[in-house]
Amino acid sequence: HLSIRRQRQMCIRDRRNEAQRKAMEESRLGIPILFGYDVIHGFRTIYPISLGQACSWNPQLVEQACAVAAQEARMSGVDWTFSPMIDVARDGRWGRVAEGYGEDPYTNAVFGVASIKGYQGEDMSDSKRVAACLKHYIGYGASEAGRDYVYTEISNQTLWDTYIPPYEAGVKAGAATLMSSFNDISGTPGSANHYTMTEILKNRWKHDGFVVSDWSAVPQLIDQGHAADRKEAARLAFNAGLEMDMMGHCYDRHMAKLVEEGKISMQLVDDAVKRVLLSLIHISEPTRPERI
C-alpha cells in the first residue's frame, strides 16, 4: 500500500498538473504557470543552514547539495526556488542571519555562485533543475539594530564595496531571477529603487531575467511612507524595474488603469512581459503541462 506521505505527494502533484493543464489549454493565451517555493537548504533531504554551509568552505559540496535539492523539488512540481540568500549580514540580532553565508562579501559571492550552479545546472529546463533567485536585492542585512523591514543607511561606496559584489557575481553566473528587498536604502525602498533594479541590474549588468518582489513588498511602500495608496505603489515599483508583484495585488488591480492614464508606458510593459515569458521558456517546457 502507498504511505500517507506518498499519497499526499501524489495529490499535490496531480493538483499541480491539473492547474498547469488548465492554464495552458483553457486560458486565453495558454501561458504556463511558474511554480515557486522556498527551497533554502534542501527540500526532502535537509542540509545544514546556509551559514553552516559557509563554515565548511566547500563550495563544490554546496553545489552538489543544491543539485539534489533541485531534483527533489522538480520532482514535486517546483520550477523556481527563492534561493540563494546572499545578504551580507554583520549584526547577530538580525533574525535572518542564518539564511545567508555570513558577513563577508566574497564568501557570499562564492557560495551564491555554487548554489546557482547546483540549482540551475547547464540547462534550467532539465527535469532535475530549478531556476534560482538571488535575494534580497539589496542591503537587507544592513538593517538598523537587527530589526527587520527597516531603514538602512548605506553610502554608495559601502553599497559597491560590501553589498553589490555577491549579486554581481550571481548575475554573471547566470541567476535567472532576483528578489527585491523589504528595506529601504538610504530613503528609497528596495522594491521602488530605480538605481539598483534598472541602472545597475539591467543597464550595467545586462541581466535579461526579471525581478520579483518579496511577499507583499509592493503595498508595503505605503507603510514606508513612499506611496499614498496601492495604485501609486504599483506605479513606483513597476517604473523602478520590478516586473512581478508577489501577492501584493497591486499590479493586477491597477496596472491597466496606470497604462491607460499614461503613468506606465507600454514599452516598459512589453519589456517586462518579454522578460517573464523568456524566463518561462528557459525554465520550463511550455508545450508540456506535465513536468513529472
Locations of the language-model features?
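Short "domain-exit" segments at the C-terminal end of structured domains
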Residues: 2, 285-292
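Glycoside hydrolase catalytic-domain context in secreted enzymes
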Residues: 6-9, 13-285
